[in-house]
Amino acid sequence: MRLALVALATLALAGCETTEEKSAQLERVAKHSKHLAEASEPLRALVGAPPSSKVKVQGTSVVHTSEGAAAVVRVRNTTGTTLHRIPILIEVKDAAGASVYTNNQVGISPSLTSVPSLPAGGSLEWVDDQVQATGTPASVSATLGDGETGGGPASLPVKASVSEQSANGGTVEGTVTNPTGAAQSEVVVYATAHHGSELVAAGRAVVNEVPASGSSHFQLFLIGDPSGASLKLTAPPTS
């Protein structure tokens, strides 16, 4: 009976929502849906397109365990200026060469379809840890757009440590700092773990906001086996 009363009370409170509140909520939902629907628009232009003259793919890797799969693309900015919002289209294939995943999907998060920023001459290991493969991932290919030019810091300082690890992954916790005078929103922290030149684990976290001249906590899960590996963390600025 108590549970029923709680449920009724919740419904009653929900019914008190004003028309203005309902309108504002519907507007937020509509904007969010439009944002997600448009997320794959830049990728459509990359299908069958020649490689970018500004951003080069230096290598690709894929790791997978029973916990999931992650694709990693090593990219480099060959220009003398910072590039922002660089579209990236990836396709993951199995050992037989059949496509098992692509990030060119309506509704996918923008953080999984673009590189936030790359400093002049800089490089980054971009991670997609949401690979919903229909088969066993074996390889990944990538096509990049040119992005937009602009300024900003090369990278946001990141401090972190691995709090837990196993053969199936590891948990990384830390802080990302924003030394600029403007808040950074939707900051992606990329994490890759290597044994020498071999990628053995990867993951990422999205921080809603890092305040101006402040810092924010993050936690991410590594896919793969990070045991004894060298961990690299990068957080490109978003503005």
Feature names for model-found ranges:
Residues 9, 16-173, 177-185, 194-239:
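Membrane engagement elements in two modes
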Residues 187-189:
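Extended Gly/Ser/Thr-rich low-complexity repeat segments
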Residues 1-14:
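Sec-dependent bacterial lipoprotein signal peptides
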